[in-house]
């Protein structure tokens, strides 16, 4: 079975457990499941966040969860040589919701979260692809979260390059920061 088939099978099993009333996501995983998640650079909470949001909000789609996992896996195996980072980025380490860059509210925050997602450094209480991230991506050209991650990876820390990508996707002017 390929890694993506394993991911989909695990996602389906976790989704079923959650919609049937089990919110203890750590109970979803066997030792083999945890080993599999580690092999793709994923943490148990990362998968659960996508399961929970799909069950509770109808978004993001399972295919989005797989695409995001594919980007993380590629980064983990290619850039990190299969070695996890010991660092954890918390809410206080990322820019605020209202911080802007070149007129784009939230852009510095979502880029910081995307960079941490790529490195596997997001605190378990943070999610790349949360409602705020989805809102930003939707309002700026219906950008798929996995595409955004790949562009953040390619930008190699250059926020201007990410901004140019967002501008090309966006057919409306940037939303002003709300106070």
Stretches found by the model and what they are:
Residues 37, 122-166:
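Amphipathic alpha-helical packing elements
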Residues 1-124, 157, 162, 166, ...:
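Polar/charged low-complexity regulatory segments
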């Amino acid at each position: 079975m390929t890694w993506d088939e394993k991911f989909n099978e695990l996602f389906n099993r976790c989704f079923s457990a959650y919609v049937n009333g089990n919110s203890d996501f750590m109970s979803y995983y066997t030792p083999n499941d945890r080993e599999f998640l580690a092999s793709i650079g994923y943490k148990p909470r990362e998968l659960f966040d996508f399961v929970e949001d799909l069950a509770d909000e109808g978004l993001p789609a399972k295919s989005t969860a797989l695409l995001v996992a594919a980007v993380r896996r590629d980064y983990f195996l290619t850039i990190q040589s299969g070695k996890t980072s010991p660092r954890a980025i918390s809410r206080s380490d990322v820019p605020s919701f209202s911080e802007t860059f070149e007129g784009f509210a939230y852009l510095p925050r979502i880029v910081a979260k995307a960079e941490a997602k790529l490195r596997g450094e997001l605190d378990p209480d943070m999610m790349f692809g949360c409602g705020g991230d989805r809102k930003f991506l939707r309002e700026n050209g219906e950008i798929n979260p996995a595409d955004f991650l790949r562009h953040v990876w390619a930008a190699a820390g250059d926020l201007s390059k990410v901004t140019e990508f967002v501008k090309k996707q966006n057919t409306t002017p940037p939303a002003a920061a709300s106070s």
